[in-house]
């Protein structure tokens, strides 16, 4: 095991403030170097400049983290002796630390990810709320007593799974830490979390608070590294009991194969989407224009549930496009540290180039460019909010996940057509319905094959409400009480109270 401690570097953000940034792997409540001393260069997508270098974990570092997590999960270890209420207090203290350091964490998130500072603050507060919520659940998730007959007593227990591997994406780095860590720890598991290679900084900042919040060594471990070595090692490790992954459907398949071919570990997957946002003739068009803009341009379009397909009923099609374009023109793109910026940078040059190539493909295949379509500014990976009309579902922009600020607009005639076309996707993460007819709202919501349906709104998530996908958008649910089921296994106990001998 690497015993070389790696402390931190100082980072100055564009506002002039200087913050402490941990750069080592967080294993056993210490920041340590990777075994082989590898480094990951971290760049700011808004400036294209190097921020710092962090430790690069490989298979050997994963092995070390698994060993300490397994040791922390042993029945005689301090963590296993914590009461459920004690676990809850640790999580609540972590929520307090996050709130007390909100500006620090949001600034690091904005520098590393490129999202606007206002969105980053919202993410950090939502993460604190999530930790506090699951802190409250820690002593409330229990089994049942089951009456069968007078000579037998039975009950169930919800027991932790064990050592859990967790792999998070780059679009919501800090918030995804909370979504993964909080329910797992509330249930009594130990975890090894892998950050996204592009955005490791805020998760490493979170680890500063773990020891002071009372978590014993080995309970929470955080590794920065790439998917090929670190992520694959977690997915295929024989001593990890469960893996939770958020990211693309393609990588989700790889995680699932690795989990199945190793020790058949339990899997939770929150994957991609090409979500339909359906606008009916009777909708409040101004309101719907706001929500469809928010549904695709929020977080620079880098949202798994982004409403990237907008279906508009034919009678209001032309007028609604005008209103969407008018709203898109009001959205400020640029410096993510400016308080009035709505849309920041795309996360990387590769992602920027991918988005631009989709726009070019759509136009080449007959889509009409209503607004945007090109780079914003000369520095940083900014893409203008882009709306394409006259899109058909055989175009790449109409059926593939772009993960950027690109909206495909498609015309429809009837409710039945809207449902059929909305469901015409391999994905099923989310959908939106805009109408003033409550009967149609419920009818369409019930018929759409999606894990979340928003009516007259979009992109509203909350830690109390489950989130996850149908079809190729994932397996399992995160958040709410449903999120606890990902991290527990049910044991049934039968007690003989005087039954006759069976033989």
From Swiss-Prot:
GO cellular component: cytoplasm; cytosol; Golgi apparatus; mitochondrial matrix; nucleus
Positions of post-translational Phosphoserine modification: 248, 501
EC number: 1.2.1.-
This protein's UniProt keywords: NAD, Oxidoreductase, Phosphoprotein
Binding site for NAD(+): 247-252
Family as reported in the entry's similarity comment: Belongs to the aldehyde dehydrogenase family.
Protein name as catalogued: Putative aldehyde dehydrogenase-like protein C9E9.09c
Upper taxonomic lineage: Eukaryota, Fungi, Dikarya, Ascomycota, Taphrinomycotina
